[in-house]
Regions:
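Basic, polyanion-binding surface patches
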Residues: 1-161
Length: 161
């Protein structure tokens, strides 16, 4: 089947997503990245799916090594915090060092200024072309603010972030 990518791109970009910082920790190594393709994927047990770009192999390896993660739900006011994750990670220390964080049941950094968070553990993954889809079991979570609205993300071109 021939696909008309030019016609498909704007329609695909209208699939609504949010903006999230995924926190990872294994032993003393911490990492985080900005994600937009996160979705609830089950009620009992509660599950979430997260798309990992294959170029982020180091993050994926850290997750499968440690098994724990936090989905920080970012809000419209969190631009400064999110901008920290647009840059490469520092060569020493943690990407979270200059941010206000706390830890919950998983020991993975949680951003205090996020709308809320989900603590989860790796369950399985599936390869899907240029991304890996991780399914994670949610272990806990809470809102940090009832005042901040979650970010809603639409893309003009469904073939680009």
């Amino acid at each position: 089947i021939d696909m008309d990518k030019e016609a498909l791109a704007p329609a695909l970009g209208k699939l609504v997503s949010g903006l999230y910082i995924i926190s990872l920790k294994h032993k003393d190594q911490e990492a985080g990245f900005l994600a937009s393709w996160v979705q609830q994927a089950g009620f009992e047990p509660p599950m979430v799916s997260i798309a990992f770009n294959k170029e982020r192999k180091a993050h994926f390896d850290l997750l499968t090594g440690g098994g724990k993660l936090v989905v920080n739900i970012m809000g419209k006011e969190n631009g400064k915090t999110m901008s920290r994750f647009f840059k490469p990670a520092p060569e020493t220390g943690s990407i979270f060092d200059e941010l206000d964080t706390f830890t919950g049941i998983t020991g993975v950094p949680i951003l205090k200024d996020s709308v809320g968070y989900l603590e989860a553990e790796y369950f399985t993954e599936m390869e899907t072309g240029d991304h890996l889809i991780v399914l994670a079991k949610v272990l806990g979570g809470a809102l940090n603010s009832t005042e901040i609205e979650p970010s809603v993300h639409l893309r003009p071109d469904g073939f680009k972030y």
